[in-house]
């Protein structure tokens, strides 16, 4: 009887020990998986780990602090687009003299008496908050066929006017690009802006004002080349060519690799002003395949382009589906980086499933701001399996722009 009780007691002890040891091992695995954040891994190795935000989010210090754990750069979802800076419905016109007093850039070939007023108030607030919190920002975007007021392309800045000629539009384009960029780099917080999506989705423009004025040759789009040249001239003026970079940004780039390469090479004919490609990455576990996507990534790298993953989200059929795809995707991205690929930034398009433009799809690796999903651990695991744990590799240094205007000033 005593032997039976002893054996029974020992069995319970062993069972209890097994439970505790299993719990300990699971806890240890979970702890290891969650012990590193995106800044310690991707931010350190690639230089920048980013996210998409809106100004109202930045006003909440709790949200900012949560975002900073995984990001050192942000992209404003809407507030820097032409519709938001210029107003979409009708132009608020001011005289050229008043524009000069406000610090706008007026090209010497600008023949009109008025320019549209640019409303910087919201974006200035966002840039200031980022500056105060040590966050950098991507300028998104200067030239786009969408979310750009139609009156910008028409006579007298009127929605009912005829389309202007190319000479007039050239002057308007130079006015806008240089006024927007110059506004930031002439101010206190200019060092916040380190990248610009100068032109967005040109290959997908249809029936736009840009095409109405300049024609529809997408891989040799004259206005795109001019926009990059104007933007680069601003960098030259403020001595920022070594610390701020300009990108062409587009979606479905894996389906249009050759056209993207042709366009960027055209932009850089005569002088390299475009650093490379922003690969918008609105992906799905059903399409594109991981191999299809990374074949495009490697094609851009072989073409000599710097590549940034700019708008990443992944539609999926559930956590298991997302976990598997995210792990394989980042294994391939990290392999490209390890093989010497010039990939300098990865930006998720939203801080959580609750703040995404894709409703009911749960395409991100956070369920709520600061609350990681299992896919987050898979993304980190893909990193540590490739590069090792933080501390075992050399972090990628980043450069803070120090805008210094040259004597050329503004006309």
From Swiss-Prot:
Pathway: Glycan degradation; xylan degradation. It comes from the Bacteria. PROSITE patterns: GH10_1 (PS00591), GH10_2 (PS51760). The active site is at 201 (proton donor), 311 (nucleophile). Residues 34-382 form the GH10 domain. GO terms for biological process: xylan catabolic process. It catalyses: Endohydrolysis of (1->4)-beta-D-xylosidic linkages in xylans. One of its GO terms (molecular function) is endo-1,4-beta-xylanase activity. Gene3D superfamilies: Glycosidases. Residues 387-411 are annotated as: Disordered. Residues 398-411 have a biased composition (Pro residues). B.fibrisolvens is located in the rumen of ruminant animals, where it contributes to the animal's digestion of plant material by hydrolyzing hemicellulose with its xylanases. Belongs to the glycosyl hydrolase 10 (cellulase F) family. This is Endo-1,4-beta-xylanase A. It comes from Butyrivibrio fibrisolvens. The lineage of its organism: Bacteria, Bacillati, Bacillota, Clostridia, Lachnospirales.
